From Swiss-Prot:
Organism of this sequence: Synechococcus sp. (strain CC9902)
Record pathway: Pyrimidine metabolism; UMP biosynthesis via de novo pathway; (S)-dihydroorotate from bicarbonate: step 2/3
Keyword Transferase: yes
GO biological-process terms attached to the record: 'de novo' pyrimidine nucleobase biosynthetic process; 'de novo' UMP biosynthetic process; amino acid metabolic process
Protein keywords: Pyrimidine biosynthesis, Transferase
Reactions catalysed, as given in the entry: carbamoyl phosphate + L-aspartate = N-carbamoyl-L-aspartate + phosphate + H(+)
Enzyme Commission number(s): 2.1.3.2
Protein name: Aspartate carbamoyltransferase catalytic subunit
Any one GO CC term of the record: cytosol
Protein backbone atom coordinates (compact mmCIF):
# COMPACT_ATOMS: atom_id res chain seq x y z
CA UNK A 1 0.00 0.00 0.00
CA UNK A 2 3.05 2.27 -0.10
CA UNK A 3 1.86 3.85 -3.36
CA UNK A 4 -1.29 5.35 -1.84
CA UNK A 5 -1.29 9.10 -2.45
CA UNK A 6 -4.85 10.34 -1.82
CA UNK A 7 -5.12 12.55 1.26
CA UNK A 8 -8.89 12.93 1.03
CA UNK A 9 -11.33 10.63 -0.78
CA UNK A 10 -13.88 12.88 -2.45
CA UNK A 11 -14.63 11.08 -5.73
CA UNK A 12 -13.18 8.34 -7.93
CA UNK A 13 -12.40 10.41 -11.01
CA UNK A 14 -8.66 10.58 -10.35
CA UNK A 15 -8.28 6.97 -9.20
CA UNK A 16 -5.92 4.83 -11.25
CA UNK A 17 -6.29 1.12 -11.84
CA UNK A 18 -3.55 0.62 -9.24
CA UNK A 19 -5.66 2.54 -6.72
CA UNK A 20 -8.63 0.30 -7.41
CA UNK A 21 -6.38 -2.76 -7.13
CA UNK A 22 -5.06 -1.61 -3.73
CA UNK A 23 -8.56 -1.14 -2.33
CA UNK A 24 -9.87 -4.44 -3.70
CA UNK A 25 -6.88 -6.33 -2.32
CA UNK A 26 -7.14 -4.78 1.13
CA UNK A 27 -10.93 -5.10 1.27
CA UNK A 28 -10.69 -8.77 0.33
CA UNK A 29 -8.22 -9.31 3.16
CA UNK A 30 -10.52 -7.57 5.63
CA UNK A 31 -13.45 -9.56 4.29
CA UNK A 32 -11.59 -12.78 5.08
CA UNK A 33 -10.98 -11.87 8.73
CA UNK A 34 -14.05 -13.60 10.24
CA UNK A 35 -12.93 -16.88 8.65
CA UNK A 36 -9.71 -16.67 10.68
CA UNK A 37 -11.64 -15.97 13.89
CA UNK A 38 -10.36 -12.38 14.05
CA UNK A 39 -13.21 -9.92 14.60
CA UNK A 40 -11.22 -6.81 15.37
CA UNK A 41 -7.83 -5.28 14.50
CA UNK A 42 -5.89 -2.66 16.47
CA UNK A 43 -4.91 -0.83 13.27
CA UNK A 44 -6.67 2.45 14.15
CA UNK A 45 -6.54 2.22 17.93
CA UNK A 46 -6.41 5.73 19.36
CA UNK A 47 -7.83 7.25 16.17
CA UNK A 48 -11.13 9.13 16.11
CA UNK A 49 -13.60 8.82 13.23
CA UNK A 50 -16.54 11.24 13.14
CA UNK A 51 -19.55 10.52 10.93
CA UNK A 52 -21.17 13.81 9.92
CA UNK A 53 -24.34 12.84 8.07
CA UNK A 54 -26.46 15.87 7.22
CA UNK A 55 -28.74 13.59 5.18
CA UNK A 56 -30.51 10.35 6.24
CA UNK A 57 -28.62 7.09 5.82
CA UNK A 58 -28.96 3.51 7.01
CA UNK A 59 -26.38 1.41 5.17
CA UNK A 60 -23.57 3.90 4.64
CA UNK A 61 -23.51 5.38 8.13
CA UNK A 62 -23.88 2.06 9.95
CA UNK A 63 -21.29 0.47 7.68
CA UNK A 64 -18.70 3.22 8.23
CA UNK A 65 -19.21 3.14 11.98
CA UNK A 66 -18.91 -0.64 12.13
CA UNK A 67 -15.83 -0.49 9.88
CA UNK A 68 -14.19 2.03 12.21
CA UNK A 69 -14.96 -0.09 15.27
CA UNK A 70 -13.61 -3.23 13.57
CA UNK A 71 -10.32 -1.33 13.26
CA UNK A 72 -10.50 -0.28 16.95
CA UNK A 73 -11.11 3.41 16.21
CA UNK A 74 -13.25 5.58 18.46
CA UNK A 75 -16.43 6.81 16.75
CA UNK A 76 -18.44 10.00 17.15
CA UNK A 77 -21.81 10.36 15.43
CA UNK A 78 -23.43 13.62 14.38
CA UNK A 79 -27.20 14.07 14.24
CA UNK A 80 -28.58 17.24 12.59
CA UNK A 81 -31.78 17.12 14.63
CA UNK A 82 -29.87 17.51 17.91
CA UNK A 83 -27.08 19.78 16.68
CA UNK A 84 -26.43 23.52 16.67
CA UNK A 85 -27.38 23.73 12.99
CA UNK A 86 -30.85 24.71 14.16
CA UNK A 87 -29.21 27.67 15.93
CA UNK A 88 -27.55 28.86 12.73
CA UNK A 89 -24.16 27.14 12.96
CA UNK A 90 -22.57 26.55 9.56
CA UNK A 91 -21.51 23.18 8.21
CA UNK A 92 -17.86 24.28 8.31
CA UNK A 93 -18.09 25.41 11.93
CA UNK A 94 -19.78 22.12 12.82
CA UNK A 95 -16.96 20.21 11.16
CA UNK A 96 -14.33 22.36 12.88
CA UNK A 97 -15.93 21.51 16.22
CA UNK A 98 -15.25 17.82 15.60
CA UNK A 99 -11.75 18.62 14.38
CA UNK A 100 -11.10 20.54 17.60
CA UNK A 101 -12.17 17.45 19.53
CA UNK A 102 -9.45 15.48 17.76
CA UNK A 103 -11.22 13.81 14.84
CA UNK A 104 -8.73 12.16 12.50
CA UNK A 105 -11.33 11.39 9.83
CA UNK A 106 -14.58 13.13 8.95
CA UNK A 107 -17.00 10.98 6.97
CA UNK A 108 -19.36 13.57 5.48
CA UNK A 109 -22.70 13.19 3.74
CA UNK A 110 -24.70 16.18 2.54
CA UNK A 111 -27.57 16.76 0.14
CA UNK A 112 -25.68 19.61 -1.55
CA UNK A 113 -23.01 18.86 -4.13
CA UNK A 114 -19.37 19.61 -3.22
CA UNK A 115 -19.81 20.11 0.54
CA UNK A 116 -17.15 17.45 1.37
CA UNK A 117 -14.82 19.03 -1.20
CA UNK A 118 -15.26 22.47 0.34
CA UNK A 119 -14.69 21.12 3.84
CA UNK A 120 -11.51 19.38 2.70
CA UNK A 121 -10.23 22.56 1.05
CA UNK A 122 -11.04 24.67 4.11
CA UNK A 123 -9.34 22.23 6.50
CA UNK A 124 -6.27 22.09 4.28
CA UNK A 125 -6.13 25.89 4.19
CA UNK A 126 -6.31 25.95 7.98
CA UNK A 127 -3.42 23.48 8.17
CA UNK A 128 -5.49 20.78 9.87
CA UNK A 129 -4.34 17.16 9.60
CA UNK A 130 -7.92 15.81 9.57
CA UNK A 131 -8.92 14.04 6.37
CA UNK A 132 -12.34 14.05 4.72
CA UNK A 133 -14.06 11.01 3.27
CA UNK A 134 -17.10 11.68 1.10
CA UNK A 135 -20.07 9.63 2.30
CA UNK A 136 -22.24 10.95 -0.55
CA UNK A 137 -22.80 14.52 -1.73
CA UNK A 138 -25.81 15.67 -3.72
CA UNK A 139 -25.77 14.35 -7.26
CA UNK A 140 -21.98 14.33 -7.43
CA UNK A 141 -20.34 11.28 -5.91
CA UNK A 142 -20.58 8.32 -3.53
CA UNK A 143 -17.07 6.82 -3.64
CA UNK A 144 -17.47 4.04 -1.09
CA UNK A 145 -20.65 2.77 -2.79
CA UNK A 146 -18.88 2.69 -6.14
CA UNK A 147 -16.01 0.74 -4.57
CA UNK A 148 -18.21 -1.80 -2.79
CA UNK A 149 -20.11 -2.36 -6.03
CA UNK A 150 -16.74 -2.88 -7.71
CA UNK A 151 -15.75 -5.48 -5.10
CA UNK A 152 -19.13 -7.21 -5.41
CA UNK A 153 -18.75 -7.57 -9.17
CA UNK A 154 -15.06 -8.48 -9.03
CA UNK A 155 -15.85 -11.24 -6.53
CA UNK A 156 -18.72 -12.48 -8.67
CA UNK A 157 -16.47 -12.79 -11.71
CA UNK A 158 -13.44 -14.11 -9.78
CA UNK A 159 -14.11 -14.92 -6.12
CA UNK A 160 -10.57 -16.14 -5.46
CA UNK A 161 -8.80 -13.09 -6.85
CA UNK A 162 -11.08 -10.06 -7.19
CA UNK A 163 -8.93 -7.56 -9.09
CA UNK A 164 -9.64 -4.84 -11.67
CA UNK A 165 -8.76 -7.40 -14.35
CA UNK A 166 -11.92 -9.32 -13.41
CA UNK A 167 -13.94 -6.40 -14.84
CA UNK A 168 -11.89 -5.90 -18.00
CA UNK A 169 -14.10 -6.13 -21.09
CA UNK A 170 -17.30 -6.85 -19.13
CA UNK A 171 -20.57 -5.24 -20.18
CA UNK A 172 -22.35 -3.67 -17.22
CA UNK A 173 -25.83 -2.19 -17.69
CA UNK A 174 -26.93 0.58 -15.31
CA UNK A 175 -30.64 1.31 -15.56
CA UNK A 176 -32.92 3.85 -13.95
CA UNK A 177 -32.71 7.32 -12.43
CA UNK A 178 -29.18 8.17 -13.52
CA UNK A 179 -29.79 11.92 -13.56
CA UNK A 180 -30.16 12.10 -9.77
CA UNK A 181 -27.75 9.29 -8.89
CA UNK A 182 -24.37 9.94 -7.32
CA UNK A 183 -24.01 6.15 -7.23
CA UNK A 184 -24.21 6.00 -11.03
CA UNK A 185 -21.50 8.63 -11.36
CA UNK A 186 -19.15 6.84 -8.96
CA UNK A 187 -19.80 3.52 -10.67
CA UNK A 188 -19.00 5.08 -14.03
CA UNK A 189 -15.55 6.08 -12.76
CA UNK A 190 -14.91 2.76 -11.01
CA UNK A 191 -16.18 0.41 -13.71
CA UNK A 192 -14.68 2.18 -16.71
CA UNK A 193 -11.48 2.70 -14.75
CA UNK A 194 -11.20 -1.08 -14.47
CA UNK A 195 -11.87 -1.60 -18.18
CA UNK A 196 -15.58 -2.43 -18.11
CA UNK A 197 -17.94 -1.08 -20.76
CA UNK A 198 -21.01 0.59 -19.26
CA UNK A 199 -24.41 0.89 -20.93
CA UNK A 200 -26.66 3.50 -19.35
CA UNK A 201 -30.37 2.93 -19.84
CA UNK A 202 -33.32 5.08 -18.87
CA UNK A 203 -35.94 7.53 -20.09
CA UNK A 204 -34.72 10.84 -21.52
CA UNK A 205 -36.05 12.73 -18.49
CA UNK A 206 -33.75 10.72 -16.20
CA UNK A 207 -30.80 10.18 -18.53
CA UNK A 208 -29.52 13.17 -20.52
CA UNK A 209 -27.49 12.37 -23.62
CA UNK A 210 -24.38 14.07 -22.23
CA UNK A 211 -23.84 11.15 -19.86
CA UNK A 212 -22.43 9.21 -22.80
CA UNK A 213 -19.40 11.54 -22.67
CA UNK A 214 -19.19 11.62 -18.87
CA UNK A 215 -15.78 9.97 -18.44
CA UNK A 216 -14.28 11.49 -21.59
CA UNK A 217 -15.34 15.02 -20.69
CA UNK A 218 -15.61 15.12 -16.89
CA UNK A 219 -17.55 17.93 -15.20
CA UNK A 220 -15.61 21.03 -14.09
CA UNK A 221 -13.55 20.46 -10.96
CA UNK A 222 -12.87 16.78 -11.60
CA UNK A 223 -9.45 15.60 -12.72
CA UNK A 224 -9.74 12.34 -14.62
CA UNK A 225 -6.85 9.87 -14.58
CA UNK A 226 -5.41 10.26 -18.09
CA UNK A 227 -3.34 7.08 -18.11
CA UNK A 228 -5.86 4.32 -17.49
CA UNK A 229 -7.40 2.58 -20.49
CA UNK A 230 -11.01 3.20 -19.63
CA UNK A 231 -13.99 1.26 -20.85
CA UNK A 232 -16.55 3.05 -22.99
CA UNK A 233 -19.92 4.47 -22.02
CA UNK A 234 -23.00 4.28 -24.24
CA UNK A 235 -26.63 5.29 -23.80
CA UNK A 236 -29.65 3.11 -24.66
CA UNK A 237 -33.24 4.21 -24.25
CA UNK A 238 -34.89 0.79 -24.46
CA UNK A 239 -34.05 -1.87 -21.89
CA UNK A 240 -34.68 -4.57 -24.48
CA UNK A 241 -31.78 -3.13 -26.50
CA UNK A 242 -29.47 -2.68 -23.51
CA UNK A 243 -29.69 -6.14 -21.91
CA UNK A 244 -28.50 -8.58 -24.63
CA UNK A 245 -24.92 -9.65 -23.90
CA UNK A 246 -24.82 -8.00 -20.46
CA UNK A 247 -22.54 -9.52 -17.82
CA UNK A 248 -24.28 -7.74 -14.93
CA UNK A 249 -27.16 -5.31 -14.40
CA UNK A 250 -27.43 -2.55 -11.82
CA UNK A 251 -30.75 -0.85 -11.26
CA UNK A 252 -31.09 2.43 -9.38
CA UNK A 253 -33.74 3.83 -7.07
CA UNK A 254 -36.09 6.49 -8.36
CA UNK A 255 -35.06 9.46 -6.21
CA UNK A 256 -38.39 11.22 -6.01
CA UNK A 257 -37.11 13.44 -3.18
CA UNK A 258 -34.62 15.04 -5.62
CA UNK A 259 -37.09 15.56 -8.46
CA UNK A 260 -38.14 19.19 -8.70
CA UNK A 261 -40.64 18.54 -11.49
CA UNK A 262 -42.79 15.76 -12.88
CA UNK A 263 -40.28 13.59 -14.75
CA UNK A 264 -42.32 10.38 -15.01
CA UNK A 265 -45.80 9.59 -16.27
CA UNK A 266 -46.37 7.02 -13.51
CA UNK A 267 -44.50 4.43 -11.46
CA UNK A 268 -46.50 1.71 -13.20
CA UNK A 269 -45.34 2.95 -16.60
CA UNK A 270 -41.74 3.12 -15.36
CA UNK A 271 -41.84 -0.45 -14.07
CA UNK A 272 -43.34 -1.63 -17.34
CA UNK A 273 -40.55 -0.02 -19.36
CA UNK A 274 -37.54 -0.32 -17.04
CA UNK A 275 -38.38 -2.62 -14.13
CA UNK A 276 -36.34 -5.82 -13.80
CA UNK A 277 -37.85 -9.28 -13.51
CA UNK A 278 -36.73 -12.86 -14.04
CA UNK A 279 -38.42 -12.88 -17.44
CA UNK A 280 -36.84 -9.64 -18.60
CA UNK A 281 -33.36 -10.76 -17.53
CA UNK A 282 -33.60 -13.65 -19.97
CA UNK A 283 -32.81 -11.07 -22.64
CA UNK A 284 -29.21 -11.12 -21.36
CA UNK A 285 -28.85 -14.61 -22.85
CA UNK A 286 -27.59 -16.18 -19.61
CA UNK A 287 -27.99 -15.78 -15.87
CA UNK A 288 -26.40 -12.52 -14.73
CA UNK A 289 -26.19 -10.85 -11.32
CA UNK A 290 -28.41 -7.91 -10.37
CA UNK A 291 -27.21 -5.11 -8.10
CA UNK A 292 -29.04 -2.23 -6.40
CA UNK A 293 -27.49 0.29 -3.98
CA UNK A 294 -30.66 0.39 -1.87
CA UNK A 295 -33.11 1.18 -0.57
CA UNK A 296 -35.21 -0.69 -3.13
CA UNK A 297 -38.72 0.27 -4.19
CA UNK A 298 -40.26 -3.18 -4.59
CA UNK A 299 -42.35 -3.50 -7.70
CA UNK A 300 -40.78 -0.39 -9.24
CA UNK A 301 -37.08 -0.98 -9.93
CA UNK A 302 -37.48 -4.75 -9.71
CA UNK A 303 -40.05 -7.33 -8.75
CA UNK A 304 -40.17 -8.68 -5.20
CA UNK A 305 -39.50 -12.15 -6.57
CA UNK A 306 -36.23 -10.99 -8.13
CA UNK A 307 -35.17 -9.00 -5.07
CA UNK A 308 -35.69 -12.06 -2.88
CA UNK A 309 -33.77 -14.43 -5.18
CA UNK A 310 -30.25 -14.82 -3.69
CA UNK A 311 -29.00 -16.73 -6.74
CA UNK A 312 -29.35 -13.60 -8.88
CA UNK A 313 -29.84 -10.55 -6.68
CA UNK A 314 -26.63 -9.41 -4.93
CA UNK A 315 -28.15 -6.65 -2.77
CA UNK A 316 -27.26 -8.36 0.51
CA UNK A 317 -23.80 -9.20 -0.84
CA UNK A 318 -23.34 -5.49 -1.54
CA UNK A 319 -24.23 -4.73 2.08
CA UNK A 320 -21.78 -7.37 3.31
CA UNK A 321 -19.02 -5.91 1.17
CA UNK A 322 -19.65 -2.40 2.46
CA UNK A 323 -17.88 -2.98 5.77
CA UNK A 324 -14.56 -4.37 4.42
CA UNK A 325 -14.43 -1.72 1.68
CA UNK A 326 -14.94 1.05 4.21
CA UNK A 327 -12.41 -0.58 6.51
CA UNK A 328 -9.94 -0.40 3.64
CA UNK A 329 -10.69 3.28 3.03
CA UNK A 330 -10.40 4.23 6.70
CA UNK A 331 -7.21 2.21 7.02
CA UNK A 332 -5.62 3.88 4.02
CA UNK A 333 -6.72 7.37 5.03
CA UNK A 334 -6.17 7.40 8.78
CA UNK A 335 -3.45 4.91 9.60
CA UNK A 336 0.24 5.54 9.34
CA UNK A 337 1.09 2.72 6.97
CA UNK A 338 4.13 1.48 8.80
CA UNK A 339 2.26 1.23 12.09
CA UNK A 340 -0.97 -0.15 10.67
CA UNK A 341 0.60 -2.79 8.46
CA UNK A 342 2.39 -4.31 11.43
CA UNK A 343 -1.00 -4.92 13.08
CA UNK A 344 -2.44 -6.80 10.12
CA UNK A 345 -2.48 -10.54 10.50
CA UNK A 346 -1.27 -12.54 7.55
CA UNK A 347 -4.32 -13.46 5.56
CA UNK A 348 -4.36 -15.27 2.27
CA UNK A 349 -6.76 -13.71 -0.19
Amino acid sequence: MSGWHHRHILDLASFSRDDFASILELAQRFRSLPVTGVRKLPALQGRLVATLFFEPSTRTRSSFELAAKRLSADVMSFSPSSSSLSKGESVLDTARTYVAMGADVLVVRHRSTSVPQQLAADLDQLGERTVVLNGGDGLHSHPSQGLLDLLTLARYFDAQKPTPQALDGKKIVIVGDILHSRVARSNLWALTGCGADVVLCGPTSLLPEEFAAFVDAPPPGLSCDPVAQRGKVTVERRLEQALPGADAVMTLRLQKERMTQQLLTSLERYHRDYGLSHARLQLCGRQVPVLHPGPVNRGVEMTSQLLDDPTICLVEEQVRNGVPVRMALLYLMAAAESAAESSLVSISS
